[in-house]
Structure formats: structure tokens, C-alpha cells
Amino acid sequence: MNNLLDILNKSINYLEKKNIKNARIVTETVFSQILGIERIMLYANFEKVLSDGDIARIKEKLNEITTQNNEISDKEIFEGNSENLKSLIDKSVSYLEKNNINEAKLIAEIIFSHVLEIDRMLLFTKYKENLDKEKTDKIRNFIQKVGKEKFPVQYLLNEQEFYGRKFYVNTGVLIPRQDTEVLVEEAIKTLRSEKTETPKILDIGTGSGAIGITLALEIPDSKIMGTDISDKALEISEKNKSLLNAENIKFFKSDLFENIEYKKFDMIISNPPYIASDETKVMSEDTLLHEPDEALFAEDEGLYFYREISFQGKEYLRNGGYILFETGYKQAETVKKIMEITGYKNVNIIKDMQNIGRVVTGQKLES
């Protein structure tokens, strides 16, 4: 049977026998490009039957990889300083691609934009210009770190955009994802529809503070508490609070509800660690190598924090208050059942742009 998973595993074994570095990542990248499926979603489509044409293109690409040296020397990124900006960008993209970096062109442009202090969309206006040695060396170092070490560009530049705002990030916190904007959107929608005067919100596992700070700025009459067990995360969330002038949010250390005294929140919101320990095979290398494990992985097949927050959370919500979770791939239905068993009403699943259940909401309603 020519299903995706069988062909993928055979391809990985083939490259490993040929001593290709990072065989799994290389293979997944090839499949992603040829099949038009995001690399992280390949395993979700493991039963997909591949056409003879797809298999032929995959074989051709794998053979090409084994017959050429895909490594590019660091010196080859920029040879000399006389080349113009367009040439340097092209070489950087080539280097990142040959080191199996997804979205190589976008990442290269982000790095150039940051170093040159110019909007990424305006880089083309400088294509014919030459860079000085200082900027060239800085860009080279950034490109090498992403290509060689698989170091996330967000950590490299200490910046990630979320909900239209730039947040400071480093390796002490998870990089805010676009998926989490679905959670924030649903929270804003719920709060505005309720028209609660000065809503009280608890953000558990705040990390960089992206969720809580965004809600604080979008709902300016709210009062928000953001908690985390990590001292590093709390330092970063405080930094973002200051950078973005979010005055109506406070951060403090707490293991879930351990240090929380207030028990009439209008909303509890959380994007907790939800990855099971056996799911590392579908995760990107940069995430595994550099993002904090404590922000990624959870016991009980990734469901531990959903159970704990759901169970304990009822004591901290006012009657009529809401609880909102972001969930991992294929977790939404299970989390919905956990919340229903725990006694929440009006439990709903909200899907993201890819039609995947991303957010689960419920309400505390007691007679």
C-alpha cells in the first residue's frame, strides 16, 4: 500500500543508509514541498495514498540529495563585501534551504530587515546597494545560527509579533503562535458579548504574557492576573507589560491555583503545555532543541493541565464565568469531554483557519 506513512518511513531509512545528515527532517521537507502539506501535518495525513507521480517526484528528489553535497560552507554565504543586497539575500536563502530550514526566504528577509532597520516589504528598494562589513558580518552570523543550530529567528531577534503587537521573547518562554490568536479572539468575543463591567480574568501559564497583555490592551477596563511557575517567564512577561504599557495586568508566581486567593473570576484562560512525550517525532527540530520543555510537554498523554485546571477552576470562577483552553491537534473533543464531566455547561469547540479544533470553551452554571 503506497500510503504516506509507509513511503515516508522507507525514505527516511534510505537517506539514513546513505549517511545523509538530519535524514528525517530532510525527508519530511521533501514530502512537504512535493505534496503541498505542512511538515507538521504530514503525520496527520498518514493514511493518504500517494499517486505514482508523487512517488516518482519524491524518488527523484531523494536521489538528487544523495548524489550531491547539500552542505554549504559558511564562507559561501557571502564571499567578500562587494555584492549587492539582492545577491546576499539570494545566497542566504540558498544556505537556509540547503540546511532544511522551512520558509527560508521569509526568515532571510526578516533577518535582513532587522539588521538594516527597514520594513521587510521595502527591501527590494535597496537591492542594488552594497552593505558595509559590520552589517554583512552581523547578518552572516544570524543566518549561520539559524541554519546550523536551527535556532529560531524569533529568539535570535528577541521578537515575535502577536495580534499586531511585537513581544519580547527569549529561550525562557514559548514563542507565541498565530494559532493562539484564535484563543484570544474567542476570549474578546465572549467578554464583549457579556458586557461585564470591569471583567476579572486569570491567565494561567502566561509565559511571555502574550495572551494576558493582549486582553488587557483590547479590553482596557479589565483587570487581569497572569501567573506562571517559571521565574524566567515572569521576568519576560513583566518586560512585555512595560514595553506595551499594559497597566491593567499583574503577574505573579503560582503553580496553577496555589497562590490565588480571589475566587470570582469572570474568565479563566490558558494555553497550557499539551504535548505528549511520545509526540516528539512530529515536532520541528528548532522547537525541540530550543523551546523550554516545561512549556511544551504534559503528563497523562498531554491532558494533565486540562484536567487540573478544569477541576480546580470551578472554585475560582463566579457563577456564569467562562473557562477557555487552547488545545493541541486532535485534543479538542477529549478536552470537551473532560470539561463536561467536570460539570461545565455550554461547552463548545472553536476551529481555526485549517478547520482544526483549536479552542474549547465552557461556562460555570450552577443553580
Question: What spans do the regions from the language model cover?
Answer:
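Non-catalytic nucleic-acid substrate-recognition regions in nucleic-acid-modifying enzymes
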Residues: 1-22, 26, 52-107
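Conserved hydrophobic residues forming the short capping helix/wall of the S-adenosyl-L-methionine
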Residues: 15, 96, 191, 241, ...
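Short helix-capping segments at alpha-helix termini
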Residues: 20, 101, 219-221, 242-247, ...
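Conserved AdoMet
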Residues: 33-83, 87, 112-189
